[in-house]
Amino acid sequence: MTRIGFMSDLHLDSNQFGHFELTTLKEVLKKERIDHLHIAGDLSNDLAHISLPFIEDLRQELPTSFNLGNHDMLGLSEQEISGYDFQVQQFGQTKLVSFSGWYDYSFVPEKSKEEHLRTKNNFWFDRRLDRELDDPSLTAHSLLRLEKLLASLDGPIIIAMHF
């Protein structure tokens, strides 16, 4: 049986994740006999220069996959973001479906759309992203894609997402 490890939100750049932390992570993964590592987003604010080299380094030790988080999307086009979404990997009969996901504010219905947008624009990192749709539309689009994909798959399914 394959042992899959899951983690997210390393924020390699802002947490100053260096050689010691990387070595420690590799040792823990080996000690726990992890066969495959999946990182569910927010590796860094720089996918090309920080996150992808980090993934390649980990892949020297064990198979590693990832999906984007909101921080990983900085500077990416919608097409680039979409290219990382809805990856399917097979582990025996079990499939791992990974995608970034998004939010539509439905967990806080007492706030108006305007209040949510004001909070986002004042505090959230996501205000720096150049997305083509508003948040509820992004969520709806993502859910449609997920429903279609799930309908085409059989057997046990693990879903990994950032949000």
Predicted features by range, described:
Residues 1-61, 73-75:
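N-terminal active-site segment of His-dependent metallophosphoesterases
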Residues 47, 74-76, 96, 104-107:
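Short catalytic/ligand-binding loop motif for oxyanion handling, primarily in non-cytosolic enzymes
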Residues 97-154, 163:
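Active-site-proximal loop/helix segment associated with metal-binding centers of metalloenzymes
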Residues 26-30, 78-93, 144-155:
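Short amphipathic alpha-helices and their capping/turn segments at secondary-structure boundaries
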Residues 1-5, 88-98, 103:
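Beta-strand-turn-beta hairpins that frame and shape the catalytic cleft
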Residues 6-8, 37-42, 64-70, 83-86, ...:
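Active-site neighborhood of phospho(di)ester-bond hydrolases with catalytic His/Asp-centered motifs
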Residues 10-12, 18, 22-23, 44, ...:
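Catalytic phosphate/metal-binding cores of nucleic-acid and nucleotide-processing enzymes, i.e., regions
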Residues 56-58, 63-66, 91-97:
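Conserved beta-sheet core of the metallophosphoesterase superfamily
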